[in-house]
Swiss-Prot record:
Gene3D superfamilies registered for this protein in UniProt: Winged helix-like DNA-binding domain superfamily/Winged helix DNA-binding domain (1.10.10.10)
Pfam families per the UniProt record, alphabetical: DUF4388 (PF14332), TrmB (PF01978)
Protein name: Uncharacterized protein aq_1845
Organism: Aquifex aeolicus (strain VF5)
Length: 230
């Protein structure tokens, strides 16, 4: 799988959503004007971030365990790399990215400091209103909680205002209703809904199809006979 694009049209929230949903393993490389960063993805989870001077060097160190030894990292310092080279870069949308599946040989167990759901929500908090409107396109949209929403939310580390928005997602409230009832600003509500959609905690409610009553063959035959007698 080759996933490429730029951060202005495809945000970190979108990228992580795709990789986490499909449980992909590989390396995501983002090139900004000032730095190039390699993000190591194991089963859809971001486990390490490190700057590289040349992209080809990423594919030289294919054994993840040996790379960790080479960089002299442990579980705590691996978490620090994500803070330094992922969380701190969320405001910068001038990068281009490419994800390549495979290449990196991961051990069976790799520590995950920040669950994908938490990183996706954090990325959503940095979206512009225009970016959120790609998914929240209409104030009359209605969302409902997914069957496993509690599991998703438990891993997302929601803020108080985000929980308030989630509570108002009940399959009946429109986006407009949520805006009015929450008392929160539009950008906060839209970012929250975007993030909750991306982690799979909520989904768009589909309108139920109203089936027209069908006439049985026997009843139809009787009606035809009556009409003939008129």
């Amino acid at each position: 799988m080759a996933l490429t694009g730029d951060l202005k049209s495809f945000s970190f929230a979108d990228i992580l959503q795709v990789l986490h949903h499909d449980k992909k393993s590989g390396v995501l490389i983002v090139e900004w004007p000032d730095i190039t960063v390699a993000y190591y993805i194991k089963d859809g989870e971001l486990v390490l971030a490190r700057p590289v001077d040349k992209v080809f060097r990423v594919y030289v160190d294919r054994d993840f365990e040996k790379l960790i030894e080479k960089l002299r990292l442990n579980e705590r310092t691996m978490a620090e790399t994500i803070k330094k080279f992922f969380l701190s870069r969320l405001e910068n949308k001038d990068g281009i990215f490419s994800f390549t599946q495979g290449f990196i040989n991961y051990p069976e167990n790799v520590p995950v400091a920040f669950p994908a759901e938490e990183l996706i929500m954090e990325a959503a908090r940095h979206l512009t209103l225009e970016e959120t409107e790609r998914k929240i396109s209409d104030e009359l949209l209605v969302f409902e909680k997914a069957p496993d929403w509690e599991v998703k939310v438990q891993r997302a580390n929601l803020k108080e205002e985000e929980r308030k928005v989630l509570e108002l997602v009940n399959g009946e409230n429109t986006v407009k209703d949520i805006l009015e009832k929450s008392g929160l600003d539009k950008l906060t509500v839209y970012r929250t809904l975007y993030g909750l959609l991306a982690i799979g905690a909520i989904r768009r409610k589909r309108k139920k199809e109203i089936r027209k009553p069908t006439i049985s063959l026997d009843l139809l035959t009787k009606l035809i006979e009556k009409i003939k007698k008129l």
